[in-house]
Amino acid sequence: SFLDTGSAGAITLPGFRRYVIDPARTTVRALVHICTAGLVTNLGELRDPRYLDVEGTVRAIEANRDIALGVKIRYSDVIVGEGDQARAALLAALEAAERSGTWLMVHIGRTPEPIADVLQLLRPGDVVTHSYTPLAGGVIDDRSLRVSPAAIEARAAGVQFDIGHGKSSFGWATAEAALAAGFAPDFISSDLHRGCVNGPAFDLPSVMTKFWMLGMPIEEIVMRCTSIPARKMGLDAGTLRVGSPADIAVLSIDEEPVSFVDCTGEHRVCDRRLSASYTYCSGVRLDPDILGVTEDLPVEISSRPMGSGS
């Protein structure tokens, strides 16, 4: 199962549904971007406030309740600007989530206002993603490596924290400090795109391996990748219970040293790694040719060299 976090906005969701979600052999759900056009690389989709679309976002969710689970905003200064303009975008995203009866996911890192001010606006069930970003404005201070007291308070109030390991959203030192302080993520996830599939994220088993190396028990890692996010998505998945859909990922443990890089360029050597062997969806084995994978975007990313990253 996949959760797409904001590729499409109100005006692009119909096309995203028709050409991506509906034909998919896997289960795909989506968050609707508060920018009406959706996520636009790093051009700053909300630097022009005319692209904020509360009404359209609410309508899009209501028309697609079976696949649209909530609202997404990328809350970085390069995306939303600064000051009142940035705050207006966050408030618009919150309004759309409130009016549609859904939850909001907030992307952080280079956050345009103090993280405490952001967290105090969030409601129980809202999600912060890129929680272990080494960038400024994260829930782990980029200088002191201390967990923000506001993050601890927000968690106690029901806000959830996601990893979303992509190109610039995971630091070894940040993750190590967070786990040592008892601030484990609610969800362990990848944020895969062309900027990170060849490093530093590679794939979800590689992200899982990083947490294994940091000392998290494998049972907890698996739960944070399967049953816990499945509940968040309202799916009868993430379980091997009799009668449940046979959605199964078969992982292998490769007992060989491998160097993993984080988003700051720091390398650490893991003495073993997880890699994907097989994936089944509703009992049907999914092979790369079924997914339409091209040579420049291989499925078995974890089998590639892992010594460098962007």
Q: What are the roles of these predicted feature ranges?
A:
Residues S1-S76:
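Divalent-metal coordination cores built from histidine and acidic residues
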Residues P14-G15, V40-E45, G83-Q85, A116-L119, ...:
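Short acidic, glycine/serine/threonine-rich loops at helix termini
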Residues A68-V71, G125, P185, A276:
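Core-facing hydrophobic residues within beta-strands of well-ordered domains
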Residues D77-N198:
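Active-site core of metal-dependent hydrolases
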Residues R123, R241-S244, C281:
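Residue-level recognition of short, solvent-exposed, well-ordered loop/turn junctions
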Residues A173-E255:
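His/Asp/Glu-enriched, well-ordered alpha-helical/loop segment
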Residues A246-V299:
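C-terminal cap of metal-dependent C-N hydrolases
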Residues T294-S310:
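Long, low-complexity intrinsically disordered regions
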